[in-house]
Amino acid sequence: MEATPQGKVSDWLGLVYNKQGSVIGYDKTGPLAMGTEEEVTALLAWRFYDAGMPWNEAVVKVRELNALAMIEVERCRPAHPLPGLYDFLVSCSRAGIALGVVTSDTTAETLKHLEWMGIRNYFCSIVGRDRVGKGKPDPEMVTLALREMRISTEECILIGDSNGDMIMAKRAGLQAAIGIAGDITSGKEYLLDADVIVTGYSDITVQLA
């Protein structure tokens, strides 16, 4: 009999569901917000191992399930820009501001998602977890992105939605760390190291010096 993890997925992945059973959010302090692909794979594999499956089989099982999930992702392409993001990118482009992406996702997947949203060309540096030795909140990804964008730490502001992003910005010595949260009050509970918290890109104004 195949081992099956017990308990709700929402309990150990931090997923939030609506009454219809659809995922509508996730814990901003949890693994989906800050974990790398390898870390999330290990977390899921542990659940199978805890249910009695040998570790090597558990890892293979998770990778198989991930492959099936990615087929559906490729079909649906569920990547959409946050409200206000496109206008923000256009404003930055017109102002001559260099933009980069640093993410716990793989570089290839990130590039794909940016292409789906039609915003790939706005970024001159894309740094995924696979391009560095250490992930967030270590500043290595930021350091690489800055080098590729040819700007200094004093010229850079980081915008992110997890406190891991905020800590990474601090450790890199950036000018500021801006946290994005749907609600300012709840954002203050987990974006503890943000210099400023906004509800979205529409709250950020780009002005020429």
How does the language model describe each region?
Residues 3-71, 83-86, 90-94:
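A metal-dependent, Asp-based hydrolase signature
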Residues 29-32, 77, 133-134, 196:
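Pocket-edge positions in alpha/beta enzyme catalytic cores
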Residues 71-77:
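Surface-exposed cleft-lining segments at the edges of enzyme active sites
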Residues 78-82, 103:
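Conserved beta-strand/loop elements of the cytosolic catalytic core of P-type E1-E2 ATPases, chiefly
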Residues 86-94, 106-209:
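Asp-based, Mg2+/Mn2+-dependent phosphohydrolase catalytic module
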